[in-house]
């Protein structure tokens, strides 16, 4: 079991960001259950970059909490590269306050949520959303965090 993380800090204010150890801990709680070897990039960005990427790839004219870009290798190529997660620092901080969640718990949730997207999970259809949210809740609770959707229930 091996996870390789390329952590890129591309935001102006690095104060109070989770550590690389935090990110690795969250990834190790999720990925090995689905894929024993994995390589991925987590890029922490400001609202401007998140907004640009969200607009370019999703047609949404605003920044978002996490964007997932799965790597799709040709069928004949075996590679452990999962893809990239782009997480917007300001959106995560804002949402944690709005949802009355500890900031570290919300960071962990964004890593879990984005990782599941890289693994092929989605939440477009109601049934898929229920499955994904249930899995997120289970994984978060295994790490000692509360149900991330508690406020919505």
Curated annotation (Swiss-Prot):
<dbReference type="GO" id="GO:0004521">
    <property type="term" value="F:RNA endonuclease activity"/>
</dbReference>
<feature type="binding site">
    <location>
        <position position="117"/>
    </location>
    <ligand>
        <name>Zn(2+)</name>
    </ligand>
</feature>
<dbReference type="InterPro" id="IPR023091">
    <property type="entry name" value="MetalPrtase_cat_dom_sf_prd"/>
</dbReference>
<feature type="binding site">
    <location>
        <position position="123"/>
    </location>
    <ligand>
        <name>Zn(2+)</name>
    </ligand>
</feature>
<keyword id="KW-0255">Endonuclease</keyword>
<keyword id="KW-0862">Zinc</keyword>
<keyword id="KW-0698">rRNA processing</keyword>
<comment type="similarity">
    <text>Belongs to the endoribonuclease YbeY family.</text>
</comment>
<keyword id="KW-0378">Hydrolase</keyword>
<keyword id="KW-0540">Nuclease</keyword>
<keyword id="KW-0963">Cytoplasm</keyword>
<keyword id="KW-0690">Ribosome biogenesis</keyword>
<dbReference type="Pfam" id="PF02130">
    <property type="entry name" value="YbeY"/>
</dbReference>
<dbReference type="InterPro" id="IPR002036">
    <property type="entry name" value="YbeY"/>
</dbReference>
<feature type="binding site">
    <location>
        <position position="113"/>
    </location>
    <ligand>
        <name>Zn(2+)</name>
    </ligand>
</feature>
<dbReference type="InterPro" id="IPR020549">
    <property type="entry name" value="YbeY_CS"/>
</dbReference>
<protein>
    <recommendedName>
        <fullName>Endoribonuclease YbeY</fullName>
        <ecNumber>3.1.-.-</ecNumber>
    </recommendedName>
</protein>
<dbReference type="GO" id="GO:0004222">
    <property type="term" value="F:metalloendopeptidase activity"/>
</dbReference>
<keyword id="KW-0479">Metal-binding</keyword>
<dbReference type="GO" id="GO:0008270">
    <property type="term" value="F:zinc ion binding"/>
</dbReference>
<dbReference type="GO" id="GO:0006364">
    <property type="term" value="P:rRNA processing"/>
</dbReference>
<dbReference type="GO" id="GO:0005737">
    <property type="term" value="C:cytoplasm"/>
</dbReference>
<comment type="function">
    <text>Single strand-specific metallo-endoribonuclease involved in late-stage 70S ribosome quality control and in maturation of the 3' terminus of the 16S rRNA.</text>
</comment>
